[in-house]
């Protein structure tokens, strides 16, 4: 975990890397790390006990109402079959009237999960929904006693988060000062030019960060019903159409949540396309020596082997070496992975010719879009001749940096 954050091994090992973490993913890892630092072992235990106590209490309360709970071993998730006089549709109607979404299984069961945000108001709301559906009267709960239904053998006996850093910063002020000390060790655009990737957006303006804490954007559940996410659907569709125009491509997917995930997705799309036209045997990826380490790492993780083509003394791709490597491997070549402009900030003058060389071999061109901001307004991947491209969330979409 620490090595992944500090060195991102694909920079060093390239095609020999065993991981491929992107800055956008590192942000989530950093947030999880700070969460553990702030709460420490005792804080994490208390949160877990609270969650499990609420779940245990609800299990007993709903069982008394006639619901049958099916998870023999549980921590935070319960699944109930309904009494004969209660239908899933009846329960759903009552829940929706109180603006609550439950999980509805295909066989008629109903379930829900508890987390650290669940409070007494939520408990009473759930109790109300299930009691009304069962046509029973219950009293409002004012306190949840600590309780556990876990078997003794499942309870952890060893210590964790024992390092000093997890046992020092448990107040807001201490945490703020700790994060500030770490920040002072870093280099950013507030200090100087950043040598790697400086042609990309490395500064996120405050206006771009505001939606992160806007209640109109955040807290939507990934499994929320379609009729409750119409605004998101409009946003996704509009963004997809705009990106089609910007990139010159025919289709867009917004599912990958980082550059590394985007690379993996793009290469899988290329593989699926080649298989669909009877070329599934192609298993080699051509990659310039100047490429970002994530490119060969992604190729290997997708099951490809890599072939490296040379660059000249100015950092440009050696077109003749690329042509020779492509020709030598044309029967097995699946794709070229190329960054435009390159990681060194160079606009390859022969990019269109490079794409033509690859296409003549029956292969596809994957363009790493890490530096997309440097070409917008001048050209786009579709015009250049690329077939697939990813756009980084922490650059093009200005999500916070994790590295």
Give the ranges of each region predicted by the language model.
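Active-site C-terminal subdomain of aminotransferase-like
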Residues: 1-61, 65, 70-72, 388-403
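Noncatalytic alpha-helical scaffolds and linker/capping helices
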Residues: 94-97, 105-132, 136
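Flexible inter-domain linker/hinge segments
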Residues: 120-195, 199-207, 212-218
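Conserved N-terminal alpha-helix of the aminotransferase class I/II PLP-enzyme fold
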Residues: 171, 216-257, 262
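Conserved PLP-binding catalytic core of the aspartate aminotransferase-like
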Residues: 65-94, 114-117
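Conserved PLP-enzyme active-site core in the AAT-like
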Residues: 62-63, 79-80, 93, 231, ...
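Conserved phosphate/anionic-ligand binding catalytic regions in large, soluble enzymes, centered on
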Residues: 23-28, 113, 187-207, 255-266, ...
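Gly-rich Lys/Arg/Thr-decorated short loops/hinges at beta-loop-alpha junctions or inter-strand turns
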Residues: 37-43, 70-74, 155-156, 213-227, ...
């Amino acid at each position: 975990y620490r090595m992944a954050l500090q060195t991102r091994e694909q920079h060093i090992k390239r095609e020999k890397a065993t991981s491929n973490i992107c800055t956008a993913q590192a942000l989530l890892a950093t947030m999880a790390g700070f969460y553990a630092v702030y709460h420490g072992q005792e804080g994490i235990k208390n949160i877990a006990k609270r969650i499990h106590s609420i779940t245990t209490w609800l299990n007993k309360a709903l069982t008394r109402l006639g619901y049958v709970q099916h998870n023999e071993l549980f921590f935070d998730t319960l699944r109930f079959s309904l009494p004969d006089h209660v239908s899933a549709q009846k329960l759903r109607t009552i829940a929706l009237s109180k603006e609550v979404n439950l999980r509805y299984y295909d066989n008629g069961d109903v379930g829900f999960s508890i987390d650290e945000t669940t409070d007494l108001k939520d408990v009473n709301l759930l109790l109300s929904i299930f009691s009304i559906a069962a046509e029973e009267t219950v009293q409002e709960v004012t306190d949840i006693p600590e309780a556990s239904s876990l078997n003794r053998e499942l309870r952890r006996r060893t210590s964790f988060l024992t390092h000093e850093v997890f046992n020092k910063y448990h107040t807001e002020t201490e945490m703020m000062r700790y994060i500030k000390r770490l920040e002072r060790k870093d280099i950013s655009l507030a200090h100087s030019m950043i040598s790697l990737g400086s042609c990309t957006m490395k500064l996120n303006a405050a206006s771009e960060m505001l939606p992160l804490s806007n209640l109109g954007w955040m807290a939507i559940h990934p499994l929320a019903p379609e009729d409750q996410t119409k605004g998101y659907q409009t946003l996704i569709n509009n963004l997809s159409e705009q990106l089609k125009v910007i990139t010159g491509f025919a289709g867009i997917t917004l599912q990958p949540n980082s550059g590394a995930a985007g690379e993996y997705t793009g290469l899988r799309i290329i593989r699926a396309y080649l298989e669909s036209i009877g070329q599934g045997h192609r298993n080699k990826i051509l990659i310039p020596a100047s490429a970002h380490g994530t490119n060969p790492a992604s190729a290997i993780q997708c099951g490809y082997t890599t072939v490296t083509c040379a660059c000249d003394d100015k950092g440009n791709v050696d077109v003749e070496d690329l042509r020779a490597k492509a020709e030598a491997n044309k029967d097995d070549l699946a794709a070229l992975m190329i960054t435009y402009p390159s990681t060194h900030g160079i606009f390859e003058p022969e990019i269109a010719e490079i794409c033509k060389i690859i296409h003549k071999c029956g292969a596809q061109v994957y363009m790493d879009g890490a530096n997309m901001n440097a070409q917008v307004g001048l050209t786009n991947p579709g015009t250049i001749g690329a077939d697939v491209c990813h756009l980084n969330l922490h650059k093009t979409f200005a999500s916070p940096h994790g590295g």
